[in-house]
Design a protein with these regions (language model features):
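Short beta-strand/loop motifs in extracellular/secreted proteins, especially
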Residues: 70, 80-85, 136-139
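Sec-dependent, cleavable N-terminal signal peptides
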Residues: 1-28
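Intrinsically disordered, low-complexity Pro/Gly/Ser/Thr-rich segments with frequent PxxP/GP/PP motifs
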Residues: 93-124
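Predominantly extracellular/luminal regions of secreted and cell-surface proteins
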Residues: 24-40
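Surface-exposed ligand/attachment interfaces on beta-rich extracellular proteins
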Residues: 41-67, 83-85
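Asparagine-centered strand-capping/turn motif at beta-strand->loop junctions
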Residues: 66, 73-78
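Terminal connector regions
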Residues: 31, 120-145
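Short, surface-exposed beta-strand/strand-loop-strand elements in extracellular ectodomains
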Residues: 79-95
Length: 145
């Protein structure tokens, strides 16, 4: 009886901890490498990148580790316009500048380059954003090469 109770309590603690971490940092997005200008021999699919659906939940935004060498891409593959919001943080002068409800038309693409982390990267080293609808796919490209 005690073993089951301890296991249950442990499981509940794990779920609470997982939720706390997940809701704090959101849905992580993996940076993808862009090759060039002299990449050497390129193999099949090496220049491809992957789109994923962005998070629509403000409580669990999509996040990525920002180094100052990223290009954030959006593709609205829906049939109507949808928006995205990129959350800023206070810079050294206490200024913020969220990109709020930026509209991306049906079938359109949008991009934002993060070459300066001030005002965007939070204390955990992450940038966060949400999309209005799961029809908006996102990709983060590492442009440091």
């Amino acid at each position: 009886m005690w073993k089951k109770r301890e296991l249950f309590i442990g499981l509940i603690a794990f779920v609470i901890l997982f939720y706390a971490v997940y809701s704090t940092y959101g849905t992580p997005l993996t940076r993808q490498t862009v090759y060039g200008p002299y990449p050497g021999t390129i193999s099949a699919n090496q220049l491809d990148f992957t789109w994923v659906a962005g998070s629509i939940e403000a409580a669990t935004p999509t996040t990525f580790a920002c180094t100052g060498n990223e290009l954030l891409l959006f593709h609205n593959n829906g049939v109507q316009a949808y928006t995205t919001t990129i959350t800023s943080v206070a810079d050294e002068y206490n200024r913020t500048g969220d990109i709020t409800a930026y509209s991306i038309g049906a079938g359109e693409f949008a991009a934002f380059k993060f070459t300066n982390v001030a005002g965007w990267r939070n204390s955990s080293g992450l940038v966060s954003f949400i999309v209005e609808n799961a029809s908006v796919d996102v990709a983060i490209l590492d442009i440091s090469r």
